[in-house]
Design a protein with these regions (language model features):
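C-terminal helix-rich "cap/oligomerization" subdomain common to oxidoreductases
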Residues: 14-38, 157, 342, 439-505
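N-terminal glycine-/serine-/threonine-rich beta1-alpha1-beta2 phosphate-ribose binding loop
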Residues: 2-175, 193-206
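Non-transmembrane alpha-helical segments in soluble domains
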Residues: 13, 58, 118, 144-147, ...
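Glycine-rich, aromatic-lined ligand/substrate-binding cores of catalytic
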Residues: 50, 255, 260-446, 458-465, ...
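Short, solvent-exposed turn/loop segments enriched in Gly/Ser/Thr/Pro and often Arg
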Residues: 79, 140-143, 159-165, 185-187, ...
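Structural recognition of the beta-strand scaffold that forms the well-ordered cores
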Residues: 44-48, 69-74, 139, 157-158, ...
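A contiguous active-site-proximal alpha/beta segment in oxidoreductase catalytic domains
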Residues: 178, 185-261
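Ligand-binding pockets and gating/stacking loops
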Residues: 57-68, 75-78, 87-88, 98, ...
Length: 505
């Protein structure tokens, strides 16, 4: 086993975005930029995106007494056609949150939209908080109108589909607002880079939700930095997703009418023009390259954030991928359908990372659609099965198996875990993600997953979705933001914008 590494608070928190993930320690109010919220004041938030995930996160925000939800926004007014984890899942959560066992009685399906968000906010502040002077929550259809009219906002929270995240975040930061968004910052690499650049220029307090408060991350860092399994050479990460449709080889041809109360133009945002179809909207947007990043972007940010901290990763130097294919019999012969519009039903992606200081080069392997790596012999020695989702560190002197994002880690086989002398706890354990961002809005340390810190993570994931379409090993120059061996793949780093929605990438 390697000799004990020197571990301290600064080595874990302080790092360059091009070499490792870390938090700056300079209070943000020293840097200037948007107005910072006094510790005695609430962070006044405009909440953009009230679909199912938006409603779930909205209820989390409302529980934080340090914030005030001033207004909500969504392109959909109110409908009962949203997918959910199981029947009445969201309705029951809302009932519990509002202490109202009859909320949603008579709904034909899962209900969400801006009017639902408004109703939840107003009911919570009046009934649960008992605010006698509460003036209500305004609901907007267009985020641009919200940013123009709501002069007293300190920040925005973005829970829209992925293709809108960067567009809204950049507009908000340029208006002097702090920003917190669901992952990813964007489904297009050039927009990830622009959002990080804008955050740095405006000094906005930013955060991307990516499970950035796991206590197992500093724990695993302490293990690996102390040589628990020697130099880590490989990491394997696998998920059972997608749960939504993928593998489509063409865009929908049907042109149903746009539902009443749904602004298709605003939902489409910067993406190329096309007729409305429900195959694009709500949770199923993730399967289309134009709107999402598939299971890699949906789940990968949760695990990759931990890996970047544990292994001090920066940008990869290469990426390659393999994917499931779709064939049909046409006129008595086999016909392969070339897929350029949606992510595959199953895929593997592989990135190569260079040496970082005294840490060896490492290859990161991703599997989705039920694919996973071979079962390690160390797990067979314990007569245990490979979990449906997981994270496996392969070192020169052993292996660590954990849950998908690093939870419940253990050295395998069990006898090696029992013999392992655990190092002392020397690294700080992170606070709640929303609390990290609130602290930054008040002029304190930036959140761990601020845009500058997650830029290389988000870019790595975007490179993975590009590799799925390129079908070859791609060489990546992060400094020049360029794929150096494939001009067509390099074009996929950029979005084809609708007129009037362009960003200066």
């Amino acid at each position: 086993m390697d000799t004990e590494k020197n571990i301290n608070r600064r080595s874990f928190l302080g790092a360059s975005s091009t070499a490792a993930i870390g938090m700056m320690v300079v209070p943000r109010h020293v840097l200037g930029g948007p107005k910072y919220v006094a510790p005695s004041d609430k962070v006044n938030i405009g909440y953009i995106g009230t679909g199912t995930q938006g409603i779930r996160v909205l209820m989390e925000f409302l529980r934080h007494k340090e914030v005030h939800i001033a207004c909500v926004c969504d392109a959909n007014r109110d409908s009962q056609d949203y997918p959910e984890w199981h029947k009445n899942e969201l309705r029951d959560k809302i009932r519990h949150f509002l202490d109202n066992p009859t909320w949603g009685t008579g709904n034909k399906g899962c209900r969400a939209g801006r009017e639902v968000g408004k109703e939840i906010v107003e009911t919570y502040y009046k009934k649960i908080r008992g605010l006698s002077n509460y003036k209500g929550c305004k609901a907007y259809e267009d985020y641009r109108e919200l940013l123009e009219k709501e002069k007293d906002l300190d920040a925005v929270c973005i829970l829209t589909p992925e293709h809108l995240h960067a567009t809204i975040a950049i507009a908000a930061m340029k208006k002097g607002k702090h920003v917190i968004t669901h992952k990813p910052v964007s489904n297009v690499l050039s927009e990830v880079r622009l959002a990080a650049k804008t955050a740095a220029e405006t000094k906005a307090a930013t955060h991307m939700f990516c499970s950035a408060a796991r206590h197992t991350t500093p724990l695993l860092s302490e293990w690996i930095w102390n040589g628990a399994i020697g130099q880590v050479r490989e990491v394997h990460n696998w998920t059972t997703r997608p749960f939504w449709p993928q593998g489509m080889t063409e865009y929908p041809k049907e042109t149903p009418p746009v539902p009443d109360g749904f602004n298709w133009d605003l939902w489409l945002g910067p993406a190329e023009e096309r007729p409305f179809n429900p195959a694009y909207t709500h949770a199923v947007f993730r399967g289309w390259y134009d709107f999402g990043t598939g299971p890699l972007g949906d789940m990968g940010h949760y695990s990759f954030y931990q890996l970047w901290r544990i292994l001090k990763l920066g940008s990869p130097v290469s990426v390659e991928a393999s994917r499931s294919e779709y064939w049909t019999i046409e006129d008595g012969s086999w016909h392969k359908h070339i897929n350029t519009v949606s992510l595959p039903r199953a895929a593997t992606v592989h990135w190569e990372f260079p040496q970082r200081g005294d840490m060896a080069p490492v290859t990161l392997h991703w599997y989705d659609g039920g694919l996973r790596p071979p079962i390690p012999e160390e797990l067979e020695m314990d007569n245990r099965k490979m979990p449906p989702e997981g994270l496996l560190f392969v070192g020169d002197e052993g292996k660590i198996l954990a849950g998908f994002a690093g939870n419940s880690p253990r050295i395998i086989p069990e006898k090696q875990m029992k013999a392992f002398k655990r190092p002392p706890e020397t690294l700080p354990r992170p606070i709640d993600e929303i609390d990290q961002w609130i602290r930054a809005c008040r002029g304190g340390e930036p959140a761990g997953a601020c845009f500058e810190n997650v830029q290389p993570i988000n870019e790595t994931i975007c490179l993975g979705t590009v590799a799925l379409r390129a079908d070859k090993k791609l060489k990546w120059d992060a400094d020049k933001m360029k794929i150096t061996n494939d001009k067509d793949a390099d074009k996929l780093l950029y979005r084809k914008y609708r007129k009037g929605w362009e960003l200066d990438v």
